[in-house]
Amino acid sequence: PPPPDSARSSLQQVRQALEAGVPIKSVTQESAVTSTAKVPDSSAPPAPAAADIPRFSLQLLRSGPCLLLADLPLGEAFQTSDPDFQLLRDVLHAAGLPPPQLLRRGEPIRWPLLSTGALAGTQDGAAARASVRDLLEHETSQQPITFIWLLGPRAMRFANRADEEAELFALTPFLGHVRLWNVPSLEALMQERTLKPQLWQHLQKLMPHWNRHD
């Protein structure tokens, strides 16, 4: 059944905040503590348990006809001097793609979202997935895109349609001719030597698809 109007309204606020790329702080223990006690509203729906609210930070970039959605394990935005960013640049160069460009003014996609110190609407896994996919759909409508690289387990989980579709190196349809590509995280590529040869094998198969759009 369709969500109630209040849920749709709150989810729409979340999506608009993500598309705008405005800096919004993620939930921390400190921000969850208020200085004054409030009388609970018995008519309000129960707040979701903390365990039901996913927490992640993702960086959105573009390289030629490819969008890149990368896990940020520490929650901090990419810096050009970071080893993982340099690795990404090298991988793209080997794939025949231009250097990556940060989108959303470099501001990461953070989840959950806060609005005036409180959770901004629905924050469960389904809401996170819907918001991330809506943001990717918005970006593909702004520029010609054929592939979206999902670098890391969180990018895979919340950009794919369902968790079970997050098989490494799998290609899944997204919107029209755009396809999602599940790729190891940059951190994993730096730590596990066996992943780079596997990545290169898959890159060689896919390179003709995006090089024809140069």
Predicted regions and their residues:
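A polyanion-binding, active-site-adjacent surface
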Residues: 1-213
